A protein has these predicted regions:
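Bacterial N-terminal signal peptides
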Residues: 11-22
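Active-site-adjacent betaalpha module
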Residues: 28-45, 54, 88-89, 106, ...
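A short alpha/beta connector and helix-capping loop motif
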Residues: 42, 60-86, 90-92, 97
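Short catalytic/ligand-binding loop motif for oxyanion handling, primarily in non-cytosolic enzymes
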Residues: 101-105
């Protein structure tokens, strides 16, 4: 167990939170260090990627490949639990959505999943300045999340376009609110969630990932969730499940 104590002014509650997160993390037999993650009020935020119907609703266009992973992880319920814990304690929440507008379908070259997403109309919206047809669409929020996302404590960023936050204003919004520590969750694990983890790390944020508050596509010979877990472990400061993370959030406030 490694407890970070680089902030000498931390309260006992915050120190206890860091211990709690470390103690409830799965035992590691991979030989890698676990730097840990302390939840510090005022510096820590919850970031949720793509909490939208196309990933999380059985009617979504990606459900056929992600649904089994979503259900196995309890992803919908776990993201909800994180939203609730954040709002109950006043922790700021940032949602990074994925939208495609008509002009995005005119790109001259694309990667494999960009081609697929555009082909199946994933996250499509009619116009950047219109919400015509948005309600209940694949680009809309999962219905049960709307009270959380419409909450006064939630900041919805501009949309990212491929996978990472390089194409939206998430980093700006975090910095403008003095956030330096990120609890990351959302969809999908090896794509937008992992890409957000990587870029936020590069931008100097401390990032932990909630391993069962995400999920990924499973295809013949390809397991996006397993791939993501490997990279979460190798890159993030800490990986923990929802129960441990919620307990840590509540203990810190």
């Amino acid at each position: 167990m490694k407890l970070t104590t680089h902030l000498p002014h931390l309260s006992f509650a915050v120190l206890a939170t860091a211990i709690l997160v470390s103690q409830t993390a799965p035992a590691q037999a991979d030989g890698l260090p676990d730097p840990g993650f302390d939840v510090v009020p005022g510096l820590t935020a919850l970031v949720v990627t793509d909490p939208q119907n196309d990933f999380l609703s059985p009617n979504g266009v990606a459900w056929g490949v992600v649904g089994a992973s979503v259900e196995a992880n309890g992803t919908i319920e776990n993201i909800d639990a994180l939203f609730t814990a954040a709002h109950d304690t006043g922790m700021p929440v940032f949602v990074s959505p994925h939208y495609y507008f008509p002009q995005d379908h005119n790109w001259q070259f694309e990667g494999a999943l960009e081609v697929l997403m555009h082909k199946i109309g994933m996250f499509d919206r009619s116009d950047a300045l219109s919400i015509d047809g948005f309600e209940g669409s694949g680009a809309d929020w999962l219905e049960s999340y709307k009270p959380h996302i419409e909450h006064e404590n939630t900041i919805v960023t501009s949309p990212h376009k491929v996978f990472g936050p390089e194409t939206n204003d998430l980093v700006l919004q975090l910095r403008k609110r003095g956030i330096s520590k990120i609890i990351l969750s959302g969809m999908s694990a090896n794509l937008c969630t992992e890409s957000h983890m990587r870029e936020l790390q590069e931008q100097g944020f401390e990032v932990m990932v909630v391993s069962d508050a995400t999920a990924a596509a499973q295809l013949p010979g390809l397991d996006g969730y397993a791939a993501a877990l490997t990279n979460f472990r190798m890159i993030a400061s800490h990986v923990a499940d929802t129960d441990a993370t919620v307990a840590a959030i509540r203990a810190a406030h």
